[in-house]
Amino acid sequence: MQEQYRPEDIESHVQRHWDEQKTFQVTEDAGKEKYYCLSMLPYPSGRLHMGHVRNYTIGDVISRYQRMLGKNVLQPIGWDAFGLPAEGAAVKNNTAPAPWTYANIDYMKNQLKLLGFGYDWSREIATCKPDYYRWEQWFFTKLYEKGLVYKKTSAVNWCPNDQTVLANEQVIDGCCWRCDSKVERKEIPQWFIKITDYADQLLNDLDRLEEWPEQVKTMQRNWIGRSEGVEITFHVADRDDTFAVYTTRPDTFMGVSYLAIAAAHPLAQQAATGNPALTQFIDECKNTKVAEADMATMEKKGMATGLYAIHPLNGERLPIWVANFVLMDYGTGAVMSVPAHDQRDWEFATRYDLPMKPVILTADGQAPDIRAAAMTDKGVLFNSGEFDGLDFSAAFDAVANRLIAAGVGERKVNYRLRDWGVSRQRYWGAPIPMMTLEDGSVIPTPEEQLPVILPEDVVMNGITSPIKADPSWAKTTVNGQPALRETDTFDTFMESSWYYARYTCPQFDQGMLDPQAANYWLPVDQYVGGIEHAIMHLMYFRFFHKLMRDAGLVDSDEPAKRLLCQGMVLADAFYYTGTNGERNWVSPVDVTVERDDKGRITQATDRDGRELVYAGMSKMSKSKNNGIDPQVMVERYGADTVRLFMMFASPAEMTLEWQESGVEGANRFLKRVWKLAFDHQQKGLASALDLTALNDDQKALRRDLHKTIAKVSDDIGRRQTFNTAIAAVMELMNKLTRAPQESEQDRALMQEALLAVVRMLYPFTPHVCFTLWRALGGAGDIDTAPWPVADDAAMVEDSKLIVVQVNGKVRGKITVAADASEEQVRALAAQEPLVAKYLDGVTVRKVIFVPGKLLNLVVG
């Protein structure tokens, strides 16, 4: 064992050993309890960032810990390899997406290995490979046959100059990111999967996910958005037309003062005939972004259609307006507006001077003042005819029943959740396996023609998808008949919705999944990933699992038992203002800072001596140039140090503030562990500890050791408070560093302690612990060593330190037998000189005794 800790020497050696021994390669073993630990697979962007390192370190710590408990642990890794960034990079670098992607995978795979993650590399998948997406295509055709897939027209972002569809992120201030043309909304046919058929299951089964963060479950509940309400039919005045609205507030029905419809509503189209102003407004609405975040903040605009609807209960004529905040894809494409009791309706009515009719009393029974804002609380009805005096619940039922009796109402359950649109008009994605025959009929690609392979040797012009630009690619035949392939590709969320299941049998070529392997490993025992995926990936992930269950591919109802959402990694951000007022962000590695006595940054300059503005801590990002390259840190300090800092600096679910001083601290700690082990080894390894011959100091140290084992086991396994587990080992190390090593018993105890410390640190810092385990004479390799078990007998305390108070003030401390009675403690306390002084000549009126902790004598 060398005297100095040199990670550059040991880490590559240990990693080579793992590779050669295939240490983390696993197979199904019915005789062992399985544990499947999975971190969300990365997009191969080119380089790992610190967010990746945090995510994968957490997963690796859990995996290694569970492995030491004797479980058969699967921890796989792969690449979410399709996606828009590859297309942009290909155009920029004059290449095709495939070679760019594969080069990135090779580079990032090497980075992952440098960090020492214990992956089963034999199961590595890349979602852009035909042997992966062929089964996704096959499954899609089966869903189509079951009636769970359909095609309909839907709005997309369209660049009229480039004649291409744009993703939302390619629309900047309403213009095309590439040519700056004004983007239009265009209706085109797209494929959808009926996730709404599973809305109730997805909602109800959230209650079964007891080990998922409540925040994620709440976000999914809100996204599914189940509501109970009434669908009401309105007749259009002076016409035969009717249209429907859905409301969750039938109690406000007598306060409706206008109706708002979507620009794409058939009534709007009819009203626009011969009305140029309305036609122009409808066209403007078509170019409105439809994301809910945009809808919430955009200016609410509208225009009267000139049409009126008849209120079905009181016969009032209600104006019908086209409004830019009503979407055809949501509900019925029409809403009833009650401006007195809905803030959005109030703002619209105020802008266009529409009437408002309050129908709900305030909590104190007064008519509401709606001059400044709507009164949105529920309450007792007034101004509502036969429904006056009813509270919300009674009014809901009464109004609903009245509408149903009149033949114009129906109770309905609605969902905010919409069917999943899986079509993308991009090239770098899995081709959708559908085809159109000469007679116009659409059929799924026959199984024998799967996979529909995406050509990889293409030329990117940055505008049109190569498979759309090449008419010959789409041409094919079915049973001798000419047919055209679908040229849209799948949303990349498709690939990431089932990859976890394919990891259980990545080489299986007889079907999508090998049922035996899938049902051995699934569900995932621990899933790790960011909370930003709560309502997209994690919803589709759950949905796909239920689809696979119903197809007989898996037995379980949910894909993952336990979910941990790690926090973001933050770093200092600095900038200077350019000549045009723009902010130029400077990397923290190029900044020199001065700090005050509390460690706060007071001044910052770059390498040119330019004074910088400190913008505080923010998420590491390219836009603020404040990312720290993990590879640089590994080269400087070693992978174990980086891993240890990542797990110690913050609770896993909280944001982590990157501080290089903290990294240096983690490195110093590992050097201390190394030095203590080196010093111990140089004196010769000790023989077995004689538990019958321990002195009091040795008993106390061994008690601390086994209490630490118990705490670290609980912190990692149950609580997942990894930072407190590391802190407990650090505290123990402080005691071990001060412990004597002269006698054989002292050294035998040190040997027991060091072997336990090395195992407790192994999940966090596996390379150094692998090396120290061998140096300390541990049996076999630490990769197969069992987790240390706390000795209950060692944790029993023979004595306790009791604080003695007189009238609530500390007057002494005494050591007593752990099971000493109140009388025994009082007798010993009375013999303590300082305590006796305060008891002299007074009467003890009350005794407060907390066994093992406190004796308080109240005197007077």
From Swiss-Prot:
Residue span of motif 'KMSKS' region:
619-623
Give the similarity note: Belongs to the class-I aminoacyl-tRNA synthetase family.
| Gene3D superfamilies named in the record | 2.20.28.290, 3.10.20.590, HUPs, Isoleucyl-tRNA Synthetase, Domain 1, Valyl/Leucyl/Isoleucyl-tRNA synthetase, editing domain
Give the matching InterPro entries. aa-tRNA-synth_I_CS, aa-tRNA-synth_Ia, Leu-tRNA-ligase, Leu_tRNA-synth_edit, M/V/L/I-tRNA-synth_anticd-bd, Methionyl/Leucyl_tRNA_Synth, Rossmann-like_a/b/a_fold, tRNAsynth_Ia_anticodon-bd
Keyword match Protein biosynthesis? yes
The places in or outside the cell where this protein is found are: Cytoplasm
Binding-site list for ATP: 622
Asked if the keyword Translocase belongs to this entry, the reply reads no
Task: Identify the gene encoding this protein.
Answer: leuS
What is this protein called in UniProt? Leucine--tRNA ligase
Record's keyword terms, sorted? Aminoacyl-tRNA synthetase, ATP-binding, Cytoplasm, Ligase, Nucleotide-binding, Protein biosynthesis
- Which principal EC class is assigned to this enzyme? ligase
**What EC identifiers does the entry list?**
6.1.1.4
Task: Provide one Gene Ontology cellular component.
Answer: cytosol
- Residues spanned by motif 'HIGH' region: 42-52
Annotated GO biological process: leucyl-tRNA aminoacylation
The entry lists its GO molecular-function terms as:
aminoacyl-tRNA deacylase activity; ATP binding; leucine-tRNA ligase activity
The organism is Edwardsiella ictaluri (strain 93-146)
Where exactly are the transmembrane stretches of this chain?
none
Catalytic activity entry:
tRNA(Leu) + L-leucine + ATP = L-leucyl-tRNA(Leu) + AMP + diphosphate
The source's superkingdom equals Bacteria
